[in-house]
């Protein structure tokens, strides 16, 4: 089960933070930014730090990140992230930083399932 979803721009600015569980704190966004975005040598789409796993994909000029605290099925996590990209493209025509910023309320509604 996902604990949260983050969307960052290329500079590491947090565009979207949606926590689904109480174990997902905003400071986890800083951890991801320091470990992945500011470190160009990171190549793996999965990063585990302690009991927290960050699964991420880069699309256009944004990073989509799923945070899990339990042993989640990685294939399902990435399926969710790629479907979120497709959903964003369907709604906005493209799914990039500008689209997320201009439609952040709708992005939150889509993440909430409303």
Predicted features and spans:
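Acidic, low-complexity cytosolic segments
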Residues: 1-114
